[in-house]
Amino acid sequence: MGRFIFISFGLLVVFLSLSGTEAECLPDWFHYEGHCYRVFDEPKTWADAEKFCSEQANGGHLVSVHSKKEAGLVGVLAYQTLESPIVWMGLSKIWNQCDWTWTNGAKLKYEAWAEESYCIHITSKKKEWKSLPCRNYGHFVCKSPA
């Protein structure tokens, strides 16, 4: 267990050192590849979390993940900060379409499904995507353009 925490912390340090401390992000947010991220330890429903993110920063949404590297970053940050099994992401199914769409309007390109559903969270420990009823409460990560 100690080795896992040490390695996870090491990965977090590497990600943060690569991202720098860019001035484009609000205080308590961190910069990574042109976006600002912040983990919130305030359990909310998926819809309330998305609304909250949109109120925190211009262009803010629940986090969208577009690569394995970004998924790893989000998983490590969420687990290191929250140690929560439920961390909402901005992925949901639009009722009148058959396509999965991120809350920022981007189409799904990278996938890491554990199972199918309507609102998706990332398991912070295993970094897998799972589904839950959207009415459940979970912690969340917000993302906005830098």
Curated annotation (Swiss-Prot):
* Descriptive protein name: Snaclec 5
Note in the entry: Shows greater sequence similarity to the beta than alpha subunits compared to other heterodimer snaclecs.
Matching entries from SUPFAM superfamilies are given as: C-type lectin-like (SSF56436)
| TM spans (from-to) | none
Query: Carries keyword Disulfide bond?
Result: yes
What interactions and quaternary structure are annotated?
Heterodimer; disulfide-linked.
Give the similarity note: Belongs to the snaclec family.
Output one GO MF annotation.
Answer: toxin activity
